[in-house]
Structure formats: structure tokens, C-alpha cells
Curated annotation (Swiss-Prot):
Pfam families: hSH3. Adapter protein that plays a role in T-cell receptor (TCR)-mediated activation of signaling pathways. Required for T-cell activation and integrin-mediated T-cell adhesion in response to TCR stimulation. Residues 276-285 have a biased composition (Pro residues). InterPro entries: FYB1/2-like, hSH3, SH3-like_dom_sf, SH3_domain. Phosphorylation is required for its function in T-cell activation. The gene is FYB2. A motif (SH2-binding) lies at residues 521-524. This is FYN-binding protein 2. The keyword Membrane applies. The lineage of its organism: Eukaryota, Metazoa, Chordata, Craniata, Vertebrata. It is found in: Membrane raft. GO terms for biological process: cell adhesion mediated by integrin; integrin-mediated signaling pathway; protein localization to plasma membrane; T cell receptor signaling pathway. Expressed in T-cells (at protein level). Widely expressed.
Length: 728
């Protein structure tokens, strides 16, 4: 063991003295149980791989090369330690091999030489790291160069690795460990101590020095920073040198402070602003209520000429009413019917003209619903129509009710419509037309072969297939068929109440379809007396308008007579009032021009005034003329305001001056100058103002009144009397 250590140290010294020397065959493996610090505590010893990657080991090993008396401070420039400490001394403690060795004096000189080279190399590393930190191509090129150097070094390191394996196995046997146990311990401990020992990379770069040592060392350290190995077996990795173990063991609590400088930069997540707004939520599907479709049947056209007709049980009264549920939409859709035990295939005039068409039968009435339907109102029928129209465009799901939807083809050819009398009715099939024997049926279309089923129409207008065994043909006139179609078109918009429709006798045979239709619609019109209907001619609307205007006219007439009676009440002659009121009533119905009516009103208003006595006429003449003329309305209002103000001022004057005499104007005077007195009882005057003299006093004061009706004292000196100036 001692000879091998000396030999390896000599090779290490030769490598640093001469750079062209072959690479180091392999570092020394420590025996089991020997700690690099000299304590038998079993702290973790760090192993550095050949490419500069740290690996921790939990083996309690002691180094055979420890200096007991010499120590040297290690201060790398780029490794930031919390405190500068010297290499601790290793005590000569007994190990599993039973002896301890001391390093020679030349080891301290070589350690100082190693530190100088390390400092220079670390400076180069930092410069290169700044230059090529973000360059992807330089990193790729470095990867390729390192891999090529590893392949060259593999042959030289084979021998050294073999020797180190033998030493390591002997140490394991001394401790009683199998080769698998230390490997597992190394794997578990390596991942824990790996990040805290990244600052030891700088002293380790001297293992793989070749032609350009500074460049190769920088490549190894950069790779160790970028890709630290998750685990590595101790047999395939060289051991750490003595001085590196001592550095790694110094101040383990200070190492995590330094490691963040060597960690690779992580790419931050993009900001929310750069990503933009999130995509909007998808719109919710519309809420659809299908209860109306479940309760009420609907006809769904499949294609052009393809119709689904709903099947169920109906009374004969229901059968007739269902025909008129969609009168205004007769050409676009097919009304649905129910009959007891059979379903009826309906068709429109458009679909009859097509040579081929398909009819589907759909069962709508659920089992257990045998109760009669209530009488629908007009609003209810309007709702039905709105619900049926969107339903026609959506085909129903045939998977839920496969037994209720059957489609079959009917071949039809154009021909003259015929009329037959049913003798034997085939009721075994669902798609056959329901009817009684000896009922008149119109043959719309039939196949060329006479024994096939015929497309027939009942006397009520229902269409369907009919298998006729014996029939008597009758071809009606074209004019009759035209009138029947016209009559059907005329009464398309007629609405029916379910209770008032009379029951039809299906066994009665009719002479012609036109007569049947006419009688039918006449009966319907009779039963519709109590039901609100639409008058096509507008006569009903005109009648209502006339009644409305008549009522309004009567009201206006009553108001007019009342107002004129009130006006005529002022007159003295009472018998004339009756005549006037009768005249007004008589002539209200006559259309007169506005001028004539105004003239009559004026005459009637002024006539009683001429008949009044003269005394009343003289007193109230002026007031009445002013009140009745709109031009003098504002004048009278102004005069009334002035009168009220004069009365108020007079009342105030009597209270202040305690004046009980009658107010009489003695004289009038004109003010020559302003009044110098400004007391409460003095009247403010302005030069040129005309004043009325009411009374005199003992002093040289006069009680005067101005144009505003205010009273007060005025000095005689300021007045100029008119009678003096205007006297002859």
C-alpha cells in the first residue's frame, strides 16, 4: 500500500513538472474506516470524478496520507468560503489496516504549486464562462471535444482503475461489507451531498490535463455545472486527492452559502401579459323544454314528399277537429289525426301530384292516456302552431321508439279523380284508411293494376290507402271539383271550437263533395256564434266603429247641451230655454261649418243681455264686456291688481296716521325737487312726479298720494300746484 502511494505521488509530481507526461493512471482509494480529517466519526468523504463531477460517499475511511505536523492555508480566488481555515491535522489513529503513514515533506510544496495552478485556471474559467454562457453552438462543440478526450484517456486509466478496485475490495472486506452495500450507500448519499460540494470543482480540474490544460479544465468544470450525474458507482470513478478531501471537509455549514453562484440559470415562466387573455368560455347550449312536444303531436316532414303522420286513438269528433288545427299552414305541413285502432295518412295537394312519396306513421299517444283532451282556446291553438313549426325541421329520434316509425313507399300515377263507394273495408293494416262500409270516398291516385291498394280520400278530406274489393266508380264533373277546392281554400282560416262542432254521421252517403263541403261549412258557421271570429269583409269592424263614434257623439252632445243651458240660465225669459235646448238637440246631427256655429253661439250668448233692464246693463256692462272679450283679459287682471294694491295702501295709511276721515282729493301738485325728509311718515318723491293732495296739517306739511297709491307727508316748498300755474 505504501509503495503504491509513493509511486502515484511521483507520477503526479512528474505530471505538473512536465505537461507532456502521460495522464494520471488513477487516484488512490482510501481504506475502509479512515476519515480524511482523522476522526473516527464517519463523516462523508467526497469523491471527485475524472471529469470534475463531485460524488459523496458514506464509507468511514481514513486516508493513509495525512500530514501530522504541517498545515498550509488554502485560499482559492473563486471559491467563497465563510471563513479561511488551515488544513486540519490528522492524528495517527489506528485503522482497520493497523498502521498509519506520514506524507513526505515534499507534499506541502506540491500542494502550494497545485493552488497556484488552480488560481490561474479558475480565472480563465470565469472569463470563458461569461463569453459562452448563452451560446448553444459553443456548448455543443465543447461536448464533442470532451467526449473525444475521454476516449483517449480511457486506455491510460484502465490500469489505475484496476488497482483501485483491488484496494477498495480489501477495505470492504475489512469492514465486513459486500460490494453491493457500499454502492447503494454511495447512490443514496451522492444525491444529498452533491449540490453542497460544487465549489470544490476548481481544485479538481488537474486530473485531465493534456496539451491545453486550461481549456480542458474549463470544459470539465462547465459540464459538471450543466449536467451533474445522479449517481455513480465507486468502482468506475477515481478517488479524490488528499488536499481536495481536506478542502471539502472544511466548514461544511458554510458551503450552501456559496453554491448558488454555480447553479445553472433556470428559465422563468412567461408572464400572463405576454400570453394574452385566456380563451373565452364556450357558450352554453340553449335551454330547451321538450314537454310541449311530448304532450302534443307534431308532424315532421322528412324530405320532399316524405311525411310522418302520427298514430293514436281518437273519437270521431276528435278526428274531425284535428283536420282544422292547422288551416293556414295546410300546404306546408300535414295535420295529424288519431282514430281508434287505425291511423290515417294525410297528404297535401302538392304531395299528391308527385309520382312517388313516402309516408311514415308515428305513434304519439302514450299507453295509459285514454282520457279525452280538454277544450283548447284560441291562445292554446296559437301556441300549438308555434311549437309545431320548429319541430317540423327536426327529425325525431327513431332509436327511442323503433316500433312507432315505419316508412313505406307508395307508387302513384296521375289520373282522373274517381269516387267509389266502399263495400268491404280492410282494417288489418295500420296504413289503411279508416271508414265504414257504404261510405263515399274519392279515389285520388291508384296503381295501374286494379287489385292493388288505392290512395283514397274520405268524405271529410282525409287521405290514405284503401284496399277495395268491390267498388262503384263515379267521375264527378271538373267544375264541381274546382268549386270544392275553392271552398276549401276560402275557409282555411276558420277556427273551430271542439265542443260546438257537430258529430258527423259517417254512414251517410252524400251526393257530391261540393255539397258536403258547403253544408259542412254552413254548420260550422252556425256553431260559431259564441266564438270570436275574424271578419274578412270588415263589416263587423265598421259596425263597432260606428257604435263607438255614436257613443262619443252622444256624450259630446250632452256636454254641449249642458254648457249652453248654463249660459241661457242668465236670461230672464225661462220659456226660451226649452226652445233653445230643443234647437240645439235638433241641429247637433247636422254638419255645420265652424263659422256658422260660432255666429249662432254669439247670438245666443248676447241675446239675453239685450233683454236685461237698463239699470243692470249700465252697472255690469263694462265688467261683462271685459270678462267676455279675450283681448281685455290682461287689462282687467292688471286693473284688479291695482285696485287691490290701492286698498291695501289705504288700510296701511289709516293705521299709521290714525286717519278716520273720508279720503278726498283736494288738489293736484307736481313735485319740484326731492324730499329732504326720509322718515317713516314722509312720502318719497322725485322731481316732475304728479301727486294728489289729500289733506293739510297745522305745519307746512301736506298729506299726498302718489301714482302707486302710497300716502305720506310732503313739504309745501317742494310742490308746485297746478291750479296756480294753469289759472287764467
Amino acid at each position: 500500500m505504501e509503495g503504491e502511494g509513493v509511486r502515484n505521488f511521483k507520477e503526479l509530481r512528474a505530471k505538473f513538472q512536465n505537461l507532456d507526461a502521460p495522464p494520471l493512471p488513477g487516484p488512490i482509494k482510501f481504506p475502509a474506516g479512515v476519515s480524511p480529517k482523522g476522526d473516527i466519526g464517519g463523516t462523508q468523504s467526497t469523491q471527485i470524478l475524472a471529469n470534475g463531477k463531485p460524488l459523496s460517499s458514506n464509507h468511514k475511511q481514513r486516508t493513509p496520507y495525512c500530514s501530522s505536523s504541517e498545515s498550509q492555508p488554502l485560499q482559492p480566488q473563486k471559491i467563497k468560503l465563510a471563513q479561511k481555515s488551515e488544513i486540519p491535522k490528522c492524528s495517527n489513529s489506528p485503522g482497520p489496516l493497523g498502521k498509519s503513514t506520514v506524507c513526505s515533506a515534499t507534499s506541502s510544496q506540491k500542494a502550494s504549486l497545485l493552488l497556484e495552478v488552480t488560481q490561474s485556471n479558475v480565472e480563465i474559467i470565469t472569463k470563458e464562462k461569461v463569453m459562452v454562457a448563452n451560446s448553444f453552438r459553443n456548448k455543443l462543440w465543447n461536448w464533442e471535444k470532451v467526449s473525444s478526450q475521454k476516449s483517449e484517456m480511457s486506455s491510460a486509466l484502465l490500469l489505475a482503475n484496476y488497482g483501485s478496485k483491488a484496494i477498495h475490495l480489501e477495505g470492504q472486506k475489512g469492514m465486513g461489507l459486500t460490494p453491493e452495500e457500499p454502492r447503494k450507500k454511495l447512490e443514496t448519499k451522492g444525491a444529498q451531498t452533491l449540490p453542497s460540494q460544487k465549489h470544490v470543482v476548481a481544485p479538481k480540474i488537474l486530473h485531465n490535463v493534456s496539451e491545453d490544460p486550461s481549456f480542458v479544465i474549463s470544459q470539465h468544470i462547465r459540464k459538471s455545472w450543466e449536467n451533474p450525474p445522479p449517481e455513480r458507482s465507486p468502482a468506475s470513478s477515481p478517488c479524490q486527492p488528499i488536499y481536495e478531501c481536506e478542502l471539502a471537509s472544511q466548514a461544511p455549514e458554510k458551503q450552501p452559502d456559496v453554491r448558488h453562484h454555480h447553479l445553472p440559470k433556470t428559465k422563468p415562466l412567461p408572464s400572463i401579459d405576454s400570453l394574452g387573455p385566456p380563451p373565452p368560455k364556450p357558450s352554453r347550449p340553449p335551454i330547451v323544454n321538450l314537454q310541449a312536444f311530448q304532450r302534443q303531436p307534431a308532424a315532421v316532414p322528412k324530405t320532399q314528399g316524405e311525411v310522418t303522420v302520427e298514430e293514436g286513438s281518437l273519437s270521431p269528433e276528435r278526428l274531425f277537429n284535428a283536420e282544422f288545427e292547422e288551416p293556414h299552414n295546410y300546404e306546408a305541413t300535414i295535420s295529424y289525426l288519431r282514430h281508434s285502432g287505425n291511423s290515417i295518412n294525410l297528404c297535401t295537394a302538392k304531395e299528391i301530384a308527385d309520382p312517388t312519396y313516402e309516408v311514415g306513421i308515428e305513434e304519439l299517444q302514450k299507453p295509459g292516456k285514454n282520457f279525452p283532451y280538454p277544450e283548447p282556446s284560441a291562445k292554446h291553438e296559437d301556441k300549438k302552431m308555434k311549437e309545431k313549426q320548429p319541430c317540423e325541421l327536426k327529425p325525431k329520434n327513431t332509436e327511442k321508439e323503433p316500433y312507432s316509425n315505419h316508412v313505406f313507399k307508395v307508387d302513384a300515377c296521375e289520373g282522373t279523380p274517381e269516387k267509389i263507394q266502399m263495400t268491404n273495408v280492410h282494417t288489418g293494416r295500420r296504413n289503411m284508411l279508416a271508414g265504414k262500409q257504404e261510405a263515399m270516398i274519392d279515389i285520388i291516385q291508384t296503381n295501374p293494376c286494379p287489385e292493388g291498394p288505392k290512395l283514397a280520400r274520405h268524405s271529410q278530406g282525409h287521405c290514405g290507402h284503401l284496399e277495395v274489393l268491390e267498388s262503384t266508380k263515379e267521375t264527378p264533373d271538373l267544375g264541381v271539383s274546382k268549386t270544392s277546392s275553392i271552398s276549401e281554400e276560402i275557409y282555411d282560416d276558420v277556427e273551430y271550437s271542439r265542443k260546438e262542432v257537430p258529430k258527423l254521421n259517417y254512414s251517410s252517403s252524400l251526393a257530391s263533395s261540393s255539397e258536403e263541403n258547403r253544408e259542412l261549412y254552413e254548420d260550422v258557421y252556425k256553431t260559431k256564434n259564441n266564438y270570436p271570429k275574424i271578419d274578412l269583409d270588415g263589416k263587423e269592424a265598421l259596425k263597432r266603429l260606428q257604435q263607438f263614434f255614436k257613443k262619443e257623439k252622444d256624450r259630446f252632445k250632452i256636454k254641449k247641451t249642458k254648457s249652453k243651458e248654463n249660459l241661457s240660465a242668465f236670461s230672464i225669459l225661462l220659456p226660451d230655454l226649452e226652445l233653445k235646448s230643443q234647437e240645439v238637440i235638433i241641429y247637433d246631427d247636422v254638419d255645420l261649418s265652424e263659422k256658422e256655429s260660432k255666429d249662432e253661439d254669439k247670438l245666443k250668448m248676447w241675446k239675453p243681455k239685450f233683454l236685461t233692464p237698463k239699470e243692470k246693463k249700465e252697472k255690469n256692462g263694462a265688467e261683462e264686456s271685459e270678462s267676455f272679450s279675450p283681448r281685455n283679459f290682461f287689462k282687467t287682471k292688471k286693473q284688479n291688481l291695482e285696485k287691490n294694491r290701492m286698498k291695501r295702501e289705504e288700510k296701511l295709511f289709516r293705521e299709521r296716521f290714525k286717519y278716520d276721515k273720508e279720503i278726498i282729493v283736494i288738489n293736484t301738485a307736481v313735485a319740484c325737487s326731492n324730499n329732504s325728509r326720509n322718515g317713516i311718515f314722509d312720502l318719497p318723491i322725485s322731481p316732475g312726479e304728479e301727486l294728489e293732495v289729500i289733506d293739510t296739517t297745522e305745519q307746512n306739511l301736506v298729506i299726498c298720494r302718489n301714482s302707486k297709491g302710497k300716502y305720506g307727508y310732503v313739504l309745501i316748498e317742494h310742490l308746485d300746484f297746478k291750479h296756480q300755474s294753469w289759472s287764467p
